[in-house]
A protein has these predicted regions:
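Bacterial N-terminal signal peptides
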Residues: 10-23
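Hydrophobic alpha-helical elements and their junctions with loops/disorder across both membrane
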Residues: 19-22, 109, 282, 296, ...
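Beta-strand-rich, non-transmembrane domain signature
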Residues: 25-250, 270-271, 315, 319, ...
Length: 483
């Protein structure tokens, strides 16, 4: 961790670039190619980030001005679709976007501005179903005359009018894995607000302090990237990344989440009554926790907004209960309130939902950092994730196993289990004595974390799909016939 003295959450810079095949007219493997040609085509990549500058001006109260200027080049026909239409995401309830420039630059260097009819705002698809959590819009820019060798440039200013996390700034970025000629990230903060960074591949320039403010700058350049192997851990585990934060460590990060999550209405009589009704007749704490887990899992629809894309605090428990939907931190808040109502302790846990098995030395939100919340029950020594269907209480979905886990109440980094029990008893009987048709009978009994997956599969199946499942299992046994 590098402290600097005198994202914002998890955005991947330069847009989401479409992948493509190498240029069909490129030289065959092993053939020589002039150095200037190889550089100009991005080493076979369909798109090159020519220039990408992001400047953030942060105030003490969390208000923010962001200035972006980004130019992408289509190296071949496969890169045209990736740069011909670009997007600027913003939350219209919190932010204002001013488009400063939008133009196509042809191969001769002549700029062709985008007309007013090529710029429009559209509702982000995932926001349409959950307006309570986010009202995201995409400022869409459609560029004219894009062909192989041309570039598109977008420059905009985004102003955050309502700070999401007052007094805190954090930003996480990892490359989009397209060649980068030049990228600069600039953070202009009050001089008395230390900025901490975990930089891998990004070069930190000496900070400059003047007029009560400090300017931190990071530069990044990269040629063509190696192909990621199938089954590899997440790129953020070993690849380039930059995480900056005004919080020095995970204990401070946990305290900030803990303070923001305080809900005076968590012990509302309706919540307590529901918990007592659901656990009536159960004496053992584990049985009570299981009943509450099952109810939240079945009755609170999971709205998958990654932690860090919204204000890092759950909604009020009474609102979650009334709406019957919520994101991961809302699931944790409601489940925790129900547990507390029957005397069972719990605390939120922050971790990464994905194939990332380490966290940056600087705390932050993002795809390669923290982006999910689950629950820890210390008295039962169990983690629980109510957002995942088909996983019984006492077990975890594999996607959150063996991950660093930040316990919010204590501020301590722990780790979720690397393994969990599973078992299968299978018995097959084949009656081949009779003439003609051979009868086949199979008995399968699952135990452990996979058992509920099987139960859930058949529980949700229609009569027709049950027959289809049986026939599929017959084929998997290497037999031919009809179930």
């Amino acid at each position: 961790m590098v402290p600097f003295y005198p994202r914002v959450f998890g955005w991947t810079l330069a847009g989401a670039l479409a992948l493509g095949l190498p240029d069909a007219h490129a030289a065959p493997p092993g053939a020589s190619q002039p150095a200037d040609v190889a550089a100009d085509t991005g080493g076979g990549a369909p798109v090159t980030i020519v220039s990408d500058v992001h400047e953030f001006v942060i105030q003490h109260d969390g208000s923010l001005d962001e200035h972006d200027d980004s130019t992408l080049r289509a190296n071949d026909a496969n890169g045209i679709d990736a740069i011909a239409q670009r997007y600027v995401w913003f939350d219209r309830n919190l932010e204002k976007v001013d488009l400063l420039a939008a133009e196509t630059i042809d191969r001769d260097g002549v700029a062709h501005p985008v007309g007013a009819d090529g710029i429009r705002d559209v509702q982000e698809p995932r926001s349409a179903g959950a307006p309570t959590f986010q009202d995201g819009l995409l400022r869409t820019v459609v560029f004219p005359g894009v062909e192989a060798g041309s570039s598109t440039r977008v420059a905009f200013r985004k102003t955050r009018t309502k700070p999401v996390n007052r007094g805190y700034f954090g930003y996480t970025v990892e490359p989009s894995r397209e060649p980068v000629d030049s990228q600069r990230l600039i953070f202009d903060v009050p001089a008395d607000m230390p900025l901490y960074a975990d930089a891998r591949g990004y070069v930190a320039l000496p900070p400059v302090t003047a007029n009560g403010r400090t300017r931190y700058e990071f530069e990044y350049r990269h040629g063509p990237y190696d192909r990621i192997e199938s089954g590899a851990v997440g790129y953020a585990t070993y690849g380039d990344r930059l995480v900056v934060s005004t919080l020095p460590d995970y204990a401070a990060f946990a305290a900030r989440y803990r303070n923001a999550a305080v809900d005076p209405g968590a012990d509302d009589p309706a919540v307590a009554q529901l918990a007592r009704t659901l656990t009536a007749g159960a004496a053992d704490p584990r049985d009570k926790a299981r009943l509450l887990y099952d109810w939240v899992q079945a009755n609170i629809r999971y709205v998958g907004l990654f932690l860090g894309e919204t204000a890092a605090a759950p909604h009020r428990v009474t609102d979650i209960l009334r709406n019957r939907y919520g994101d991961c931190k809302d699931h944790v808040a409601l489940f925790g309130a129900l547990l507390a109502a029957v005397g069972i302790r719990s605390e939120p846990v922050l971790l990464n939902l994905g194939s990332v098995y380490t966290l940056p030395s600087v705390p932050g939100y993002g795809g390669g950092a923290i982006n999910h919340a689950i629950t820890w029950l210390p008295d039962l020594a169990r983690y629980a994730d109510t957002t995942t269907a088909g996983i019984a209480f006492g077990y975890l979905p594999p996607i959150v196993m063996d991950r660093p886990a930040l316990l919010v109440d204590t501020g301590v980094l722990s780790r979720t289990p690397a393994t969990q029990p599973r078992g299968r008893l299978a018995r097959v009987e084949i009656d081949a004595a009779g003439a003609g048709t051979t009868r086949f009978h199979a008995y399968v009994e699952d135990d452990g974390w996979t058992a509920e997956l099987e139960r859930n599969l058949f529980r949700r199946a229609t009569p027709d799909s049950v027959a289809q499942l049986a026939n599929n299992r017959l084929r998997q046994s290497g037999l031919r016939g009809r179930a």
